[in-house]
Amino acid sequence: MLRFLKRWFRRLFAKQDVKLGLYGPPNSGKTTLANRICKDWLGEELGKVSKVAHETREVQMKESVTIKSKDGRELQFNLVDTPGIATKVDYEEFLKAGMPEKKAKKRAKEATKGVIDSIKWLDDMDAVVVVLDATTDPYSQVNITIIGNLQAREIPVTIAANKVDLRKANMKKIQAAFPQYNIVGISAKYGKNINNFYEEVFDLIGA
């Protein structure tokens, strides 16, 4: 309750300081979505995207992002793109991606620190968009861990089911896994359904 009141007062008296976090497992499309938001409203990207897991290993923040709703409302927030959360980071997965052993071990160490930092940053979040890959099993241990941490902190959540442009995408499975949350299917890469996503952000933050 104390965390909830802290976030409520911060939104009430300092709306420009509202923090919207993008959380999710590695390679779910968090940075792709962050780049889509920043390009749509600021004309520039936020971070680098890669097919190799844990490309984002440090928290990245873009301040003063202002979006507009269909009915003309404006919402300003600080967008926080976090490293992918994993229950285990093994340097061997980077070896399989073709990295030299020394670089793979360094990447694994950085990725582990990134996971810890992501969890720490949760206490500063006013709202969170959990970005899930709609082509993968939503009942994974890491997804349950992320949702559990958010529930424990009473942080408002919307789920973005990403990659719905792919044939294997299964929105119904995600909806069945997390019926307590609003879920919007998007393709961050191609911008599919992105306007509906922005409307969800307005509802999430309560603007």
Cite the ranges covered by each PLM segment.
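Short, glycine/charged-enriched secondary-structure capping and boundary segments
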Residues: 36-37, 92-95, 143-147, 172-176, ...
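Canonical P-loop GTPase G-domain recognition
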Residues: 19, 163-207
